[in-house]
Design a protein with these regions (language model features):
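Bacterial Sec signal peptide processing site at the extreme N-terminus
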Residues: 16-37
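Boundary/linker segments of alpha-helical solenoid repeat arrays
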Residues: 70-73, 103-118
Length: 133
């Protein structure tokens, strides 16, 4: 090899060595398990949308156990609350909405969710009972 080629290879090697230790913060904070958990949550929501509530509840609970991001944890608890309300389990519905709001106190339901005759009033009641942040 010529001198220039050797210098170029050494420079490339040095750059690769330096860059290998520089992961973005997003990559460092979002390990592979979170991708799996997020995927499980998405699947659980699809199951919910298809009316398969028992399977959806298990999948969404599994996504929580797999390690969702904070924002997705709130979303998961919200969907669990919806399913408990649909199933007539008002206490569990309230508990899930409470967990949702403990994670994300500023969360509001989408207009189409807030207008639901079963869980809309429950969410409103739980939110009103939460300490102001």
């Amino acid at each position: 090899m010529r001198g220039k080629e050797v210098c170029a290879l050494v420079l490339i090697w040095a750059m690769l060595l330096v860059l290998s230790g520089c992961q973005s913060q997003a990559v460092q904070e979002f390990p592979l398990t979170k991708f799996k958990a997020e995927s499980m949550l998405d699947e659980g929501i699809r199951q919910y949308d298809n009316g398969d509530y028992k399977v959806a509840a298990r999948t969404i609970q599994g996504s929580l156990e797999a390690g969702l991001t904070t924002r997705s944890q709130a979303r998961a608890h919200k969907y669990l609350a919806f399913m408990y309300c649909i199933g007539g389990q008002q206490n569990q519905c309230r508990d899930e909405f409470r967990r949702t709001l403990e994670i994300d106190p500023k969360l509001d339901l989408k207009p189409e969710e807030a207008g639901h005759p079963i869980w809309g009033p429950v969410f409103k009641s739980v939110k009103a009972s939460m300490p102001k942040q």
